Amino acid sequence: MPELAVMELGRQLCGKMKKQRKAEMTVLTVMKGLEIHFYLPDTHQLEYFKDCHTAEDLCVEGCQEDATSHLCADNLFALSEESQDLWYAPNHAFKITEETSIKLHYRMRFYFTNWHAPVRTESPVWRHSLFKHKGVSVSPKGPEGTPLLDAASLEYLFAQGQYDFLRGLAPVRAPQNEAEKHEIENECLGMAVLAITHHAKSNDLPLSGVGAETSYKRFIPDSLNRTIKQRNFSHVYVYNNVFKNFLNEFNSKTIQDSNITLYDLKVKYLSTLETLTQGLGRETIEPKILKVSGESDGSPALTLPSGDDGLGYEVQVSGTTGISWRRKPVPNILIVKDKTKSKKNKADKQSKKEMTKRKTVMTIFSDFFEITHIVIKESCATIYSQDNKTMELDLFYRDAALSFAALVDGYFRLTVDAHHYLCTEVAPSSVVQNLENGCHGPICTEYAIHKLRQEGNEEGTYVLRWSCTDYNYIIMTVVCIEMDLCESRPVPQYKNFQIETSPQGYRLYGTDTFRPTLKELLEHLQGQNLRTENLRFQPVLVGLGQPRKISNLLVMTRDREPDSQRQPQVSQLSFHRILKEEIVQGEHLGRGTRTNIYSGVLKLKSEDDDDMGGYSQEVKVILKVLGSGHRDISLAFFETASMMRQISHKHIALLYGVCVRHQENIMVEEFVQYGPLDLFMRRQSIPLSTAWKFQVAKQLAGALSYLEDKKLVHGNVCSKNILVARDGLDGEGGPFIKLSDPGIPITVLSREECVDRLPWIAPECVQDTANLSIAADKWGFGTTLWEICYNGEIPLKDKKLTEKERFYAAQCQLASPDCEELAKLMTHCMTYDPRQRLFFRAIVRDIDMVEKQNPSIQPVPMLEVDPTVFEKRFLKKIRDLGEGHFGKVELCRYDPRGDRTGELVAVKSLKPENREEQSSNLWREIHILRELYHENIVKYKGIWHEEGGRSIKLIMEFLPAGSLKEYLPRNKAHIDLKTLLNYAVQICQGMDLLASRNYIHRDLAARNVLVENENTVKIGDFGLTKSIKDNEGYYTVKDDLDSPVFWYAPECLIHCKFYRASDVWSFGVTMYELLTYCDISCSPMSVFLTMIGPTHGQMTVTRLVKVLEEGKRLPKPDGCSDRLYCLMRRCWEATPEKRIDFKGLIANFQQMIDNQ
């Protein structure tokens, strides 16, 4: 190098050093108020000296300052305080006083790597496109949607990227060796080339001499500048010349020959910045303590403190990968090789191994669509994901926790749901207001029209959306019906109306009146007629609709599209087939809607068992059996199983599969230890804590949020369909619940059955079961939350079906808890407009918010329980007791506690084929037994009904000894005449009560007298019993039923008239049965058939009447005294008026007993 050149270079360097020292000695003036600085050189800072401003409002003003579109401004930018390394949440309020001194930077915070899509190994990033959603083919090389950034946003990002690169806010990656170090330096110089060229082109400077005019040092990181300064003059001189030559060659050949644009330079600069720097596109948070936990096994959270080396853990948030964490890596220190040594010593080798080991891989916690909500408590931020996994970060101060929550919340809105917030503490006021008003963000016109088409294109319906271009306008896109002159039919057209926003309020553009709020303006417009051109209509708002609605607000990637884009396959039935040999049916546990529930065992095979032919494992399961009598709803049953097959969630019960056994269809589901939630809650002697109840509610809401994301409808959300897997009463781990299958869907139930399920069924589904949707599950959740609050109490349990219908018709609400926020949450779930019900993600978030208030839930006053109303699911069948022509009687255990301590009862029901015809008779029997209470009449316990009351069952006391017809032959040796007379007295006493109440039994026989014990009998089976009027004294049979003719008096057979005395005749026949010990060979039917000869049908009655008119009667039984037989004959007088009554019979029998 020539000596003069070296001297000149030294003089220039000395001059620059003096200027630098002079600048450092300059005393800065203290700023006042709040300043927002921009990275664009021509944009002046914003200054505020008074009032209160939110970060979101300041961001909007910043976007307007640099001409960023509303679409990009709405969710990409935030305010940062560099001195504190802090981002402010959008709802943070800056209260500016005379003492305020805050300097903020307006920055793009939310960044997606590969948004420019040059890296083929990574997924490109784009805003959602309707064309792709509709299945329109897109070129694999071209964009799959609209670009992520507009021109102004790209310009600003480029300026921000330069700033971060030069000042080390985006530090270059650490080199692993000397070669890579030189490679990184060259890349930094390449960045300078791009920046200088962009500077020259944007300012219309000649490219040929730009290298001589501009120093590269202004465009490389400060750290690299310091490194270059430490080198000798000759090396720097060469360095400068090499750079100038490369810059000139790049501008003269590459730029001009390839027609490179400013846009290309920006994209190349930013894409290179992603690979050259470390951490671009992701934020790294270093908490004091990190806790990561999963809830499945109830284990405590995994606490991750600092290690022995003082290094803790770090959490990274990225727009493309979600949230992850790892142990902080050891700082990489570049060791320069000592050329005098041929080998490293063993200590160096060991050190290198340790360093490699410490470069830990990131562990994924969750993607954004898996997050349900975020909770802030002081300086701790806790993220909850589906399956109730949690990540808790204990940060150094509260603002850091809010900053972290705002980061995750912002990415969630960009990638999952543009109209939802995960955390109330950082919720943007614009999102909250949009939700309240049913207004969309700045979606484009195509999406507004798409939504209106989905809603049916009804005239006057409109979508509210913020303008994509103008921050001061809201657009109403309205459906207008016009006549198509060519096709002579009405067709929908879409008109846009503008709503102007200003400090005075809101007004429809072109009108004069401002309304203070958007909601008031919309309410005003609701009753108005709007006109446009020659059209006139009344506006009707279409709300935001279901969560995760597609729009151009969503940022998409090929490998991470929301589940809502993939429709569940419900049309194709799919479930695992279980062979009948693989299940063993156990005891009856109760009844569901048209199903019977049993315990059972499922035999499972392993891969080795396939060869051996055996089973290696047995699992306890629940069997839900749909009987052969319900084959008409088998398809609906299979659809439920197919839906459950698509589900995998720890808070939803596992469906093993379906077994077809003969004509029965069986759903095989996992056994859950503590059974239904409502029974569990009622069994607790000590009140359950509020925290316990909230944990159950959150788990249920999380499971339903999972179903909502998959667009699957449960359809029968209630506490008896929630199973308790872990009670959590000891405080360890808390409760753990599982949502069971919905059973038979309401779409195949009758209206009466649907009304019977109120208030769990949503009102719109009562009107038409085809309205069953996810919104119905939200109503069911609201009702279930009410049950949980009140310890399993049944809402509206004292209401009849008609009263329940009126409850809905009047749009009534259940009694609200004392806690105002909890009552508000229930109301939002149970609003009668299904479109206004909260999304389950919002429900999960709000439950946590209410829980933080630590409310006390006062139990409702316990209503008096009707002991005569039995719930069908608690009737556990043991065996059949008997069967007649019209019905049957079963022995069941009524076991509401589920611990096999319930009482045994007899359950009488009609056969399905006789249900329509005979139900009135069974109801009559129920009403009679309700009114009769006597020690010698079988006790009425109550009823249960299903199918909306169309199917009923009579619950009576169970008498294990059976009827006299069965009891007497078995115990003849132990029963003497006195015992028989005692039985006769008891029967007469019961019949006398019946007669005094103006009832006629009409079916008195030994088969209908039940034995309680060896000393007591009771009259049963009042199925044919009739009520008579006082002034008539008889009842005329008007139905053609099978009748016990051999026990009937002549007037019954001839005139079909029944008197009280007719029962006396039947008693005489019953007395004959007692005295013959119900011997089949001499039964009344056998004796009378012998008298009348072979016959059948109506001829039997005719011949029987003739025999009776001839005065023939049943003979005197063996061992019967003349006095006793004479008394029996008095029961068989041909004329009813001449027959003895029951009081007379009692007196005579009592005398006989006394004489024994």
Curated annotation (Swiss-Prot):
It is found in: Endomembrane system. It catalyses: L-tyrosyl-[protein] + ATP = O-phospho-L-tyrosyl-[protein] + ADP + H(+). Residues 32-419 form the FERM domain. It is an enzyme of class 2 (transferase). GO terms for molecular function: ATP binding; growth hormone receptor binding; metal ion binding; non-membrane spanning protein tyrosine kinase activity. Mn(2+) was used in the in vitro kinase assay but Mg(2+) is likely to be the in vivo cofactor. Its EC number is 2.7.10.2. One of its GO terms (cellular component) is membrane. GO terms for biological process: cell differentiation; cell surface receptor signaling pathway via JAK-STAT; cytokine-mediated signaling pathway; growth hormone receptor signaling pathway via JAK-STAT; intracellular signal transduction; protein phosphorylation. SUPFAM superfamilies: PH domain-like, Protein kinase-like (PK-like), Second domain of FERM, SH2 domain. ATP binds at L881, G882, E883, G884, H885, F886, G887, K888, V889, K908. The keyword Nucleotide-binding applies. Its cofactor is Mg(2+). It is a peripheral membrane protein. The modification Phosphotyrosine is found at Y1034, Y1035. The active site is at D1003. Tyrosine kinase of the non-receptor type, involved in the IFN-alpha/beta/gamma signal pathway. Possesses two phosphotransferase domains. The second one probably contains the catalytic domain, while the presence of slight differences suggest a different role for domain 1. The protein kinase 1 domain is also called the pseudokinase domain and has a regulatory role through the transactivation of other JAK kinases associated with signaling receptors. This is Tyrosine-protein kinase JAK1. It comes from Cyprinus carpio (Common carp). The gene is jak1.
